Amino acid sequence: MHTPIKAITLLILILGARQGLAQHYLEVRGADTKYRYFDWNYTFANSALVDMFYVGVPGSNEFNLGGGYGFKPKPCLTLAPLVYAVIGKEAEQRGIKIALLVMLEKEGWKVNSFLGHFERISGDVDDYQVLDTLDVSRVVHGPFEVGFSSGFFRAGGKWNPQNGPLFKLNDRLGAWYVSWRFGPDNELRFSRNFLFK
């Protein structure tokens, strides 16, 4: 096992050993492009977090295990730098992903963004950058939100941007999302998340 992956594993074990009030977050996504995503993260009372997610598209199945810390420069804003060990099923992919999670809620507006950079350690998968996703929404009535969803995947100097409308329905367990994004590959995406305190 490479030294960076050992360091990330140790960080996750240390963070996982802390005691305190916790918050679990689960999310499942799917799309007509055969995109699939499963995420579980655990945030401690001290804002340290552990995150594990799987993302798959045709020809790629990637597992990410990492963690980080959430900073709140303002009560409405959370910035969470994250580091992941990345293992891909195909092409003997191994690497590190450095990411930034941004969450903002203010006066009915909500912004959520995950921006990441994958750095290859071994295997045949090139370095890449990903925005998955940038969602901007506004509460319009009760549990309903409308907004805009944007994302991209950049590898080998080639971009695959997607942009389009977003609709969201909140309930006591989390939220349902649907977005219709346009770009080189149009995508109808569905998502469900759960938040447990």
Residue ranges and their predicted role:
Residues Y84-G88:
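Extended, low-complexity, charged alpha-helical tracts
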Residues D32-L49, P58-F63, G70-T78, K89-K197:
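Outer-membrane beta-barrel transmembrane domain signature
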